[in-house]
Amino acid sequence: MNRIDGREFNELRPIKITRNFNKFAEGSVLIEMGETKVICTASIEDKVPPFQKGTGKGWITSEYGMLPRATEVRNPREVTKGRPSGRTMEIQRLIGRSLRAVVDLEALGERTIWIDCDVIQADGGTRTASITGSFIALADALNKLVEKGELQKIPLKSFVAAVSVGIVEGNKLLDLSFQEDANALVDMNVVMTDKGEIVEIQGTGEGGPFSRQNFEELLDLAAHGIEQIIKIQKEVLSDIADKIGVENVEVDSGNSQSQQG
């Protein structure tokens, strides 16, 4: 199968990450995956939701939205409709869950980190790009707390990233564009850590059921892509990457830092 943009079946779209994109937020990036572009910011708030009060633990939460002309046809802002759509709620909860999975909430203390993801151009994979970019914004925000002396270390247990995979015209493909996703018989979003641990899998048989073999092959394809994405994350965060996951390498400091996936 010849892909629209000429990529191989197991090839990611070009990834560009601009760090510190917003001068006000404690952490921010513009992430570009092909033609999909998302601004991700991390903001620190010195309080927690009511259910976390008195626990000594912090919280990571997310909001997600798309600009009206992020898509080919203008979509009204959801605020004008009075409430977020079901899709928006699903995505922002996914982003929050994915990031909380790698944060030591007890070490964070009773603080909330708000992750805001604003899609400025959508060509497939907006939720996975949001997770990948938000991790970098979150890492920078947490590092600022360390630099201010409010935390002893960055409370991140590992890196985390996400990618889409799917079956289009009988072919298993990595990192689907919008057109590929629209034509997919099966599509999956996979979130994994740099240790190869699975955080979340969202898989749907759009054109009917799919076999366990196809599921496992798609998962392997996603793991291949996420390994490459996390390598890029580590390059972007090269000045603080060795401070992430340090609680897992107290005996042998060479273990996790040298891993790329």
UniProtKB/Swiss-Prot annotation:
Gene3D superfamilies: GHMP Kinase, N-terminal domain. Phosphate binds at R87, G125, T126, R127. Belongs to the RNase PH family. NCBIfam families: RNasePH. It comes from the Bacteria. It catalyses: tRNA(n+1) + phosphate = tRNA(n) + a ribonucleoside 5'-diphosphate. One of its GO terms (molecular function) is 3'-5'-RNA exonuclease activity. Keywords: Nucleotidyltransferase, RNA-binding, rRNA processing, Transferase, tRNA processing, tRNA-binding. HAMAP family: RNase_PH. It comes from Caldanaerobacter subterraneus subsp. tengcongensis (strain DSM 15242 / JCM 11007 / NBRC 100824 / MB4) (Thermoanaerobacter tengcongensis). Its EC number is 2.7.7.56. GO terms for biological process: rRNA catabolic process; rRNA processing; tRNA processing. Homohexameric ring arranged as a trimer of dimers. Signal peptide: none annotated. This is Ribonuclease PH. Phosphorolytic 3'-5' exoribonuclease that plays an important role in tRNA 3'-end maturation. Removes nucleotide residues following the 3'-CCA terminus of tRNAs; can also add nucleotides to the ends of RNA molecules by using nucleoside diphosphates as substrates, but this may not be physiologically important. Probably plays a role in initiation of 16S rRNA degradation (leading to ribosome degradation) during starvation.
